[in-house]
Amino acid sequence: MLRTYQPKKRQRKKEHGFRKRMKTANGRKVLRRRRLKGRKVLSA
């Protein structure tokens, strides 16, 4: 059976990367929340 997680660096960056987050208002909200929470890593 095929495993569900087949990691790809490019796909990960494209979907969950910093620039993708910055593009939308909600994405920026995500980054803001993660900054306030004190996350070391904000996005993929």
UniProtKB/Swiss-Prot annotation:
Its cellular-component GO annotations read:
ribonucleoprotein complex; ribosome
List the biased-composition ranges (Basic residues). Answer: 1-23, 29-44
Annotated region Disordered: the residues are 1-44
Q: Which residues form a coiled coil?
A: none
Could you state a single Gene Ontology molecular function term? structural constituent of ribosome
Gene Ontology terms describing biological process: translation
- Hey, what's the signal peptide range on this chain? none
UniProt keywords (A-Z) are: Ribonucleoprotein, Ribosomal protein
Q: A Pfam family in this protein?
A: Ribosomal_L34
Q: Which PANTHER family match?
A: LARGE RIBOSOMAL SUBUNIT PROTEIN BL34M, MITOCHONDRIAL RIBOSOMAL PROTEIN 34 FAMILY MEMBER
Sequence similarity:
Belongs to the bacterial ribosomal protein bL34 family.
Q: What is the protein name for this chain?
A: Large ribosomal subunit protein bL34
Species of origin reads: Acetivibrio thermocellus (strain ATCC 27405 / DSM 1237 / JCM 9322 / NBRC 103400 / NCIMB 10682 / NRRL B-4536 / VPI 7372)
